Swiss-Prot record:
It catalyses: phytyl diphosphate + 3 NADP(+) = geranylgeranyl diphosphate + 3 NADPH + 3 H(+). It is found in: Plastid, Chloroplast membrane. Keywords: Chlorophyll biosynthesis, Chloroplast, Membrane, NADP, Oxidoreductase, Photosynthesis, Plastid, Transit peptide. The gene is CHLP. It comes from the Eukaryota. One of its GO terms (cellular component) is chloroplast thylakoid membrane. Residues 1-43 form a transit peptide. Pathway: Porphyrin-containing compound metabolism; chlorophyll biosynthesis; Cofactor biosynthesis; tocopherol biosynthesis. It comes from Arabidopsis thaliana. Coiled coil: none annotated. One of its GO terms (biological process) is chlorophyll biosynthetic process. This is Geranylgeranyl diphosphate reductase, chloroplastic. Catalyzes the reduction of geranylgeranyl diphosphate to phytyl diphosphate, providing phytol for both tocopherol and chlorophyll synthesis. One of its GO terms (molecular function) is FAD binding. Pfam families: FAD_binding_3 (PF01494).
Length: 467
């Protein structure tokens, strides 16, 4: 049923994620070309020659989950890897939720997970709270991490795998004149000796992975195009111990046009504090007003708290028009891989970084050959086939359920259904479409229609009162 697909896509994928643990080349040693004399075909005969006396050299710009995962995969696959990250202690206004499958797929140690959330409350505009974790099994949870901890761990792991990690700011790149000439990167390196100004340097590389976030300079350098973006605003609040006990394994999501006209507000638990935040695409200038409303909705539960950090950052709303150019590819937020409605981005960032790196490792035969755009395009094709439908469906979901407070009330009402919860959590936790029941799918469709009808009736009554 279309409704079920929409709900499954809210936090999940349309097919299972599989991981490759070994990097084995599948590129044949010789290429058989059609006997056609066209200038476009000639390049195939010279694409990806063997590299003499050196390994393929790849720069990863940005050291978040996408960059860290990409750098580790490249280094393990025999690629000479350089990772450039501007802020080694970067904190980001990110809820920090990761699905259970990410812990296993990326072999994350449990000590970097601050909280294991097993209970979630979805709170409607009229403050009706629905518990949406009732179907979780005993071993299942949503991991809560701090980005500065997760990012540092992934960078450290990449370095241990053989990547060179540079504390630096990427400035620009000079594109090669020839198809196999190097890219020249211009960057400022900070070594603790030159102060805040740093030292300007250059570097030549064979390929570039842009993992430098929503304001990606790598994206600008390949004319990747613009996209809609949300402003996320978050305050980290240290609350009294007795208040923190309430949030020990609980996260809250608030919907309503007071907290955001097109997103939601959240209270997510961290190690010794809570993260309270919201976001919006359409009313960025009002973000502080929405943040205040989010705090007010949760005020009784965070009473006595002290704000210890304030964070704001742009978050992309859909993939960029262009994510690849020759030997440059975008991943993570730089590519626009954040889902609407849920705002999930950490898993998709790390996954895209790994997938892009795997394509380079395979195409280069573990660093022995030059790569071309065709090798990187395999990453995009695989990504789009697996994940792009999720982004498209979530666009529709946001338009249907986030368009008005009555529609949000209907959405929260629908979330009270245990079948909806089971399908949603199975999809989110494991990034797969869980097998459903045809009978339950029919019931769900009927209930969804009923919720929307009631929402529209409520909207009409509100409009009458406002006349």
């Amino acid at each position: 049923m279309a409704t079920t697909v929409t709900l499954k896509s809210f936090t999940g994928l349309r097919q299972s994620s599989t991981e490759q643990t070994n990097f084995v080349s599948h590129v044949p040693s010789s290429l058989s070309l059609p006997q056609r004399r066209t200038s476009l075909r000639v390049t195939a005969a010279r694409a990806t020659p063997k590299l003499s006396n050196r390994k393929l050299r790849v720069a990863v710009i940005g050291g978040g989950p996408a960059g860290g995962a990409a750098a580790e995969t490249l280094a393990q696959g025999g690629i000479e890897t350089i990772l450039i990250e501007r802020k080694m202690d970067n904190c980001k206004p990110c809820g920090g939720a990761i699905p259970l499958c990410m812990v296993g797929e990326f072999n994350l140690p449990l000590d970097i997970i601050d909280r294991r959330v097993t209970k979630m409350k979805m709170i409607s505009p009229s403050n009706i709270a629905v518990d949406i974790g009732r179907t979780l099994k005993e071993h299942e949870y949503i991991g809560m991490v701090r980005r500065e901890v997760l990012d540092a761990y992934l960078r450290e792991r990449a370095e241990k795998s053989g990547a060179t990690v540079i504390n630096g700011l990427f400035l620009k790149m000079d594109h090669p004149e020839n198809w196999d000439s190097p890219y020249t990167l211009h960057y400022t390196e900070y070594d603790g000796k030159t102060g805040a100004t740093g030292t300007k340097k250059t570097m030549e590389v064979d390929a570039v992975i842009g993992a430098d976030g929503a304001n990606s300079r790598v994206a600008k350098s390949i004319d990747a195009g613009d996209y809609d973006y949300a402003i996320a605003f978050q305050e980290r609040i240290r609350i009294p111990d007795e208040k923190m006990t309430y949030y020990e394994d609980l996260a809250e999501m608030y919907v309503g046009d007071d907290v955001s006209p097109d997103f939601y507000g959240w209270v997510f638990p961290k190690c010794d504090h809570v993260a309270v935040g919201t976001g919006t695409v359409t009313h960025k200038g009002d973000i502080k007003k929405f943040q205040l409303a989010t705090r007010n909705r949760a005020k009784d539960k965070i009473l006595g708290g002290k704000i210890i950090r304030v964070e704001a950052h742009p978050i992309p709303e859909h993939p960029r028009p262009r994510r690849l150019s020759k030997r440059v590819a975008l991943v993570g937020d730089a590519a626009g891989y954040v889902t609407k409605c849920s705002g999930e981005g950490i898993y998709f960032a790390a996954k895209s970084g790994r997938m892009c790196a795997e394509a380079i490792v395979e195409g280069s035969q573990n660093g022995k050959k030059m790569i071309d755009e065709g090798d990187l395009r395999k990453y995009l094709e695989k990504w789009d086939k697996t994940y792009l439908p999720t982004y498209r469906v979530l666009d529709v979901l946001q338009k249907v359920f986030y368009r008005s407070n009555p529609a949000r009330e209907a959405f929260v009402e629908m979330c009270n259904d245990e079948y909806v919860q089971k399908m949603t959590f199975d999809s989110y936790l494991y990034k797969r479409v869980a097998p459903g029941s045809p009978l339950e799918d029919i019931k769900l469709a009927v209930n969804t229609i009923g919720s929307l009808v009631r929402a529209n009736a409520l909207r009409r009554e509100i409009e009458k009162l406002s006349v």
